[in-house]
Regions:
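Loop-to-helix entry region of an early transmembrane alpha helix in multi-pass inner-membrane enzymes
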Residues: 7-29, 64
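Specific aromatic-rich, kink-prone transmembrane helix
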Residues: 74-91, 104-106, 123-124, 373-377
């Protein structure tokens, strides 16, 4: 969008504005598709209004709609994909529109975030099993999404010299666990210490180690000899396993410190407090059409209310979103609606990918897809079997 519009207008502000408008429409479209899905299931208008209010009145949705991050269209793709699964499985709406949504949103999930690719691969076998009775209709868009994403991700991106995340990005948690063992002055054999020192200088590792933030140690590895780590993966895997068996408490503590924000309910995170355009020399500037102190103060209060109002503040908690997902799955199991479990697959697979490789303990945008899909998870758990039975 940016390069196309810039080529037409030669104006960077217009090009960025067009992309921002597209992102706003994409996010709004995903919500509209969700509401339409519920309407087709005869959900009561009052419930639909409550869900609409969640998206319209919670301020971080509005701020994120104009925030140029890949996490925002990614979250919209997850909601599209989840709703398409609901339509195709529970509602049995096999049509070209829903299959097209499944395909396009599947490609977006695979390409917009690196963990999305792995989550899609993790969920795919279960999706294939869940749709085994509708294989002729559903399998083609799923495999087509996988094939197109693989072609774009590897040969095309390689041809255009698009850099993929380096290896250390995918091993943030094991790296933090090994670092915790070192910083706790645990015993290491001479061979283990020598292997680690082939990659990093241990002189300042205690000063750099942050239990909730892996970037310091990642940069230490990059400043050292990351190539040695990549070429000796087996040795470092054995080292990680050996230290884990020897010091399980250190590993568990390091893991909790690195991931608690995504599953601990009392983990408020100030969201969307920064708005505007970061200072650059590219000519893009923040030019609000509606300004004034009243607007600014209203926005500030709306954002800060999450830290002031107890129940309302749970909507700012990533941990609460995680437990809502688990609660919804539990309700479906208790009600013996096992066929609905397939609708939770994208969220579960993506959450597991975050918990397996997050570089920071609290980052709302990493699990914004979970928050955007909150009403979907809750309403899916209580959907009646018959489409004409209102909720």
């Amino acid at each position: 969008f940016y390069y196309f519009c810039y080529g037409l207008t030669k104006n960077m502000v217009i090009a960025v504005s067009v992309y921002t408008f597209f992102q706003m429409c994409l996010l709004a479209g995903s919500v509209a598709y969700f509401i339409s899905t519920l309407r087709s299931h005869k959900i009561r208008p009052f419930v639909l209004l409550l869900i609409t209010a969640f998206y319209a009145l919670i301020p971080y949705h509005a701020v994120f709609s104009v925030t140029v991050w890949k996490d925002i269209p990614f979250a919209a793709a997850v909601l599209f994909f989840s709703c398409a699964i609901l339509r195709l499985s529970v509602q049995n709406q096999i049509c070209l529109k829903n299959l097209a949504v499944l395909f396009i949103s599947g490609v977006m999930i695979c390409l917009f975030r690196s963990n999305g690719w792995y989550a899609f691969l993790l969920a795919l076998p279960f999706l294939l099993f869940g749709f085994r009775h509708k294989a002729k209709a559903v399998y083609p868009p799923l495999f087509a999404a996988l094939l197109l994403a693989a072609v774009v991700k590897y040969p095309i991106m390689s041809a255009f010299r698009v850099e993929q995340p380096d290896f250390i990005e995918s091993v943030s948690i094991p790296m933090q666990q090994i670092t915790a063992v070192i910083c706790n002055d645990r015993y290491l054999t001479e061979e283990e210490r020598a292997l680690i020192e082939e990659v990093v200088d241990l002189t300042y590792i205690r000063d750099l180690y942050n239990p909730t933030f892996a970037d310091n140690i990642k940069e230490l590895v990059r400043a050292g000899n990351q190539d040695y780590l990549v070429s000796h993966k087996d040795e470092f895997l054995n080292l990680w396993i050996a230290l884990g068996l020897r010091y399980p408490g250190d590993y568990l503590t390091a893991y909790v410190n690195q991931t608690y924000g995504y599953w601990y309910p009392d983990s408020f995170y100030l969201v969307a407090e920064a708005e505007g355009v970061s200072a650059t020399d590219l000519g893009v500037s923040h030019t609000p059409l509606i300004g004034g102190p009243l607007v600014i103060k209203t926005k500030e209060i709306a954002i800060k209310l999450g830290s002031m109002v107890p129940i309302y503040g749970t909507l700012w908690s990533m941990g609460v979103a995680c437990w809502v997902l688990l609660f919804s799955i539990s309700v479906s199991v208790i009600r013996r609606d096992y066929h609905k479990l397939i609708c939770y697959l994208p969220g579960v697979a993506l959450l597991l990918s975050v918990l397996a490789a997050t570089p920071v303990a609290t980052e709302f945008r990493y699990v914004y897809f979970l928050v955007l899909c909150l009403p979907f998870y809750l309403i899916t758990a209580v959907l009646p079997e018959e489409a004409d039975a209102p909720v």
